[in-house]
């Protein structure tokens, strides 16, 4: 009991220190980019969320857009088979909240940003909502949120779980201090055997662990619409043009690609730059200007009729807009401090996939893609040659598309396995 109390106080102190260290960056985003203004009352516990109706409640949580998006087939199936349940969906980012509202409010879900995990804030929210089940997407588990839910009698599950090598070392250190961070979880449904070994290394019993594959490979028919013609028309791309979509781009990705794009000046190759963070838009623009690349902004009505390069300065469209591409690159993979983003979205839109050398956030998936030749791993030296070959050789592009489709087909049963495991837990509960 004393150790648990001490751990909670130390954790609170760590969060407070982290807040003050991050405060300058946070306030910069508030005053110069208008971020967090709509969500601060919920984040700091000034305003408490309210869930309508009666009946059992399941609380889903994911860090941001990707983690909450993969919940879509799960919520749809849950609503079909257990309509008496109420849904709550939380996320840590404003972009994630916008995505969750678009996807889940029509299903009757209550969506809001997750309050800060300080014990004086999150515990009162958990007590008010009193969830019967809490489901964490991929690994964004928060200590007080998890432990307070368990104290009130909730079941807690991790789905599509993963644990990086860096995180494994960090949680192994906590284990040596006598704290198993993930111990309160009832079940861990993981993407891969490697992640299973890492969770076992930090003290999780194998009896709690199921390996089902990556849920992101599952495409619900209602979500699999390929809007290639729609987006190519909106972007004003002719049938002779070839489009490269550079998704989730960070400044270091832009630096590498700017050198390559300069070789396609005045050609039929069009480049769509999609920043990961809109607050870095000016930095992206300066890098393109420095490289002598003329570009337009989507928000200002620019199109490929006027420019060979466009910056897509709008949130929430990347996954859909991949469908317009002839080649796609996933950003964050030329930046060792980032380590990549969702590699599956281009494949789901039947587009050849490229990614850089830094992909440790999804290293297992990246290795699978390389083994199946469903994705191209490139570096600064090979990038221009690979892009040129794909642009000039339609057969090669089609071969990568087919290999991507085959890869997704082999992995698509992961959702069904995950659902069957969760369903068995739901039906056993006495609500």
Curated annotation (Swiss-Prot):
Residue ranges crossing the lipid bilayer per the database entry: 5-27
Q: Mind telling me what this protein is named?
A: 3-deoxy-D-manno-octulosonic acid transferase
Q: In which pathway does it act?
A: Bacterial outer membrane biogenesis; LPS core biosynthesis
Keyword Transferase assigned to the entry: answer is: yes
Q: Could you say which residues bind CMP here?
A: 275-276, 315-317, 342-345
Function per UniProt: Involved in lipopolysaccharide (LPS) biosynthesis. Catalyzes the transfer of three 3-deoxy-D-manno-octulosonate (Kdo) residues from CMP-Kdo to lipid IV(A), the tetraacyldisaccharide-1,4'-bisphosphate precursor of lipid A. Thus generates the genus-specific LPS epitope of Chlamydia, composed of the trisaccharide alpha-Kdo-(2->8)-alpha-Kdo-(2->4)-alpha-Kdo.
Which transformation does this protein catalyse, written as a reaction? Answer: lipid IVA (E. coli) + CMP-3-deoxy-beta-D-manno-octulosonate = alpha-Kdo-(2->6)-lipid IVA (E. coli) + CMP + H(+); alpha-Kdo-(2->6)-lipid IVA (E. coli) + CMP-3-deoxy-beta-D-manno-octulosonate = alpha-Kdo-(2->4)-alpha-Kdo-(2->6)-lipid IVA (E. coli) + CMP + H(+); alpha-Kdo-(2->4)-alpha-Kdo-(2->6)-lipid IVA (E. coli) + CMP-3-deoxy-beta-D-manno-octulosonate = alpha-Kdo-(2->8)-alpha-Kdo-(2->4)-alpha-Kdo-(2->6)-lipid IVA (E. coli) + CMP + H(+)
> Gene3D superfamilies, alphabetically?
3-Deoxy-D-manno-octulosonic-acid transferase, N-terminal domain, Glycogen Phosphorylase B
Where it mainly occurs, coarsely classed, is membrane
Instruction: Kindly indicate whether the keyword rRNA processing belongs to this entry.
Output: no
- Native species: Chlamydia trachomatis serovar D (strain ATCC VR-885 / DSM 19411 / UW-3/Cx)
UniProt entry keywords in alphabetical sequence: Cell inner membrane, Cell membrane, Lipopolysaccharide biosynthesis, Membrane, Signal-anchor, Transferase, Transmembrane, Transmembrane helix
GO terms of biological process kind: lipid A biosynthetic process; lipopolysaccharide core region biosynthetic process
Q: Where is this site: Transition state stabilizer?
A: 138, 216
Q: Where in the cell is it found?
A: Cell inner membrane
What gene does this protein come from?
Answer: waaA
Stored Pfam families? Glycos_transf_N (PF04413)
Gene Ontology CC entries for this record: plasma membrane
Task: State the annotated membrane topology for this chain.
Answer: Single-pass membrane protein
PANTHER family per the UniProt record, alphabetical: 3-DEOXY-D-MANNO-OCTULOSONIC ACID TRANSFERASE, MITOCHONDRIAL-RELATED, 3-DEOXY-MANNO-OCTULOSONATE CYTIDYLYLTRANSFERASE
Similarity comment: Belongs to the glycosyltransferase group 1 family. Glycosyltransferase 30 subfamily.
Q: Where are the active-site residues found?
A: 67
């Amino acid at each position: 009991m004393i150790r648990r109390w001490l751990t909670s106080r130390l954790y609170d102190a760590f969060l407070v220190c982290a807040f003050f260290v991050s405060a300058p960056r946070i306030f910069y985003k508030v005053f110069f980019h208008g971020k967090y203004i709509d969500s601060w009352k919920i984040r700091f516990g000034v305003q408490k969320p309210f869930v309508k109706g009666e009946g059992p409640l399941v609380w889903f949580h994911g860090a941001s857009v990707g983690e909450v998006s993969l919940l879509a087939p799960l919520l749809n199936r849950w609503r079909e088979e257990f309509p008496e349940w109420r849904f709550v969906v939380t996320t840590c980012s404003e972009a994630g909240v916008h995505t969750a509202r678009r996807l889940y409010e029509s299903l009757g879900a209550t969506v809001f940003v997750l309050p800060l995990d300080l014990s004086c804030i999150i515990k009162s929210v958990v007590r008010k909502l009193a969830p019967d089940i809490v489901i964490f997407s991929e690994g964004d588990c928060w200590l007080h949120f998890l432990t307070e839910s368990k104290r009130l009698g909730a079941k807690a599950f991790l789905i599509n779980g993963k644990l990086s090598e860096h995180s494994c070392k960090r949680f192994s250190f906590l284990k040596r201090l006598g704290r198993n961070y993930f111990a309160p979880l009832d079940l861990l449904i993981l993407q891969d055997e490697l992640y299973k070994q890492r969770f076992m290394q930090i003290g999780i019993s194998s009896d709690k662990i199921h390996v089902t594959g990556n849920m992101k490979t599952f495409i619900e028919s209602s979500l699999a619409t390929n809007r290639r013609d729609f987006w190519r028309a909106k972007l004003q791309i002719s049938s002779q043009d070839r489009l490269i979509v550079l998704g989730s781009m960070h400044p270091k990705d832009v630096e590498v690609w700017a050198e390559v794009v300069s070789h396609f000046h005045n050609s039929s190759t069009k480049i769509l730059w999609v920043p990961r963070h809109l607050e870095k838009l000016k930095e992206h623009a300066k890098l393109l200007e420095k490289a002598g690349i003329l570009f337009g902004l989507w928000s200002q009505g620019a199109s490929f009729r006027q420019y060979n390069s466009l910056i897509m300065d709008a949130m929430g469209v990347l996954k859909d807009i991949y469908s317009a591409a002839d080649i796609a690159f996933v950003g964050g993979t030329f930046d060792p401090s980032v380590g990549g983003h969702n590699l599956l979205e281009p494949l789901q839109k039947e587009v050849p996939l490229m990614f850089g050398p830094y992909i440790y956030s999804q290293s297992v998936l990246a290795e699978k893609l390389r083994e199946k030749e469903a994705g191209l791993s490139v570096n600064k030296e090979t990038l221009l040659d690979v892009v040129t070959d794909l642009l000039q050789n339609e057969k090669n592009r089609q071969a990568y598309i087919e290999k991507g489709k085959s890869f997704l087909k082999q992995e698509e049963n992961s959702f069904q396995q995950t659902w069957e495991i969760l369903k068995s837990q739901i039906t056993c509960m006495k609500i």
